[in-house]
């Protein structure tokens, strides 16, 4: 769990160095509100991004939505993309779904279907642009104004302040408002406090691993192996925990661990060793049991889709 805050122009010029010294793990920064107009940019956003980057604070962003229909939502999407250009957040980008000032209610609150479609329009557009996307909502909005099942693929930032723990599954929990005791050194609204949050997902690791939000995707790990056809040593993305020949008694099970971005195939070069079906052991990791049923020596091979078949080691059954 990481502890964080969310801030906007109302927090003034945040002392990010002091906030970091107090143990701040992340920040969610308001970048603006409504349609794509410069007059609706948050005047503190650019500074907050610079200061978070300078102090090593992972950050994400949010836009307060005034959209009444998917057409409005497309403008809000462009607003986000304009302000995010050239920046590399390590947390998702959220659409803030609420009606704090009554704007939507005064104009006829859109239906649940329309509000859900507004979120989908923005989040899908963010994902198409390479960002992790999500939405912010409180309990009332989740229960009466949005359809969470249709938004399950997006990060959920849940506003449920002043309770011991959230009453529904969420990725980020807004745990306190100033009115419920939320405070953070360097970030408190003058004469008040600060919104505080907790993240149950290690988003910095996920963003880097998946190459989202402008971060380069790390190259897949490789391991040298002998190509079966040419006999040349090549690099394969199927990394084994076994690189030397194996010798086991007849009937003994040997477990091979494979790490690969795609599910590889494992085969024996001849009879004598049973290669059991692969079983998943986490993301991009598989286990394969090898059992010798006839004495002798057998080559064990792997193949990754798009790569050559490789001889990995010899399995001797005694």
What are these regions (language model features)?
Residues 81-95, 99-101, 146-169:
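Structural recognition of alpha->loop->beta junctions
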Residues 223-318:
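Extracytoplasmic soluble-region selector
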Residues 9-11, 33, 63-65, 99-101, ...:
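A mature extracytoplasmic/lumenal domain signature
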Residues 1-11, 17, 21, 149-230:
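Functionally critical loop-and-helix segments that line ligand-binding/catalytic clefts
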Residues 59, 132-134, 156:
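Hydrophobic anchor at the start of a short beta-strand
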Residues 1-121, 127-129:
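Substrate-binding cleft of extracellular glycoside hydrolase catalytic domains
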């Amino acid at each position: 769990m990481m502890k964080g805050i969310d801030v906007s122009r109302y927090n003034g010029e945040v002392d990010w160095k002091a906030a970091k010294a107090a143990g701040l793990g992340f920040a969610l920064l308001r970048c603006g509100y409504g349609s794509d107009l410069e007059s609706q940019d948050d005047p503190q956003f650019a500074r907050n991004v610079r200061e978070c980057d300078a102090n090593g604070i992972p950050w994400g962003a949010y836009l307060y939505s005034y959209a009444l229909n998917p057409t409005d939502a497309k403008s809000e999407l462009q607003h986000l993309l304009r302000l995010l250009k050239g920046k590399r957040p390590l947390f998702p980008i959220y659409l803030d779904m609420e009606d704090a000032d009554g704007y939507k209610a005064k104009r006829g609150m859109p239906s649940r279907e329309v509000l859900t479609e507004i979120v989908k329009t923005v989040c899908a557009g963010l994902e198409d642009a390479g960002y992790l996307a999500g939405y912010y909502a409180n309990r009332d909005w989740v229960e009466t104004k949005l359809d969470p099942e249709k938004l399950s693929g997006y990060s959920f930032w849940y506003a449920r302040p002043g309770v011991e723990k959230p009453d529904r599954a969420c990725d980020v929990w807004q745990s306190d408002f100033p009115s419920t005791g939320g405070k953070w050194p360097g970030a408190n609204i003058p004469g008040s406090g600060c919104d505080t949050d907790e993240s149950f997902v290690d988003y910095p690791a996920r963003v880097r691993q998946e190459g989202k939000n402008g971060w380069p995707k790390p190259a897949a790990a490789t391991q040298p192996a002998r190509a079966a056809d040419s006999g040349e040593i090549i690099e394969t993305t199927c990394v084994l925990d076994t690189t030397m020949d194996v010798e086991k008694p007849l009937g003994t099970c040997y477990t091979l661990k494979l790490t690969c971005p795609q599910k590889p195939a494992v085969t024996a070069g001849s009879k004598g060793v049973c290669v059991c079906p692969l079983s998943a052991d986490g993301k991009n990791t598989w286990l394969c049991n090898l059992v010798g049923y006839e004495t002798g020596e057998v080559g064990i091979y792997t193949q990754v889709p798009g790569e050559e078949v490789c001889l990995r080691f010899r399995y001797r059954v005694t």
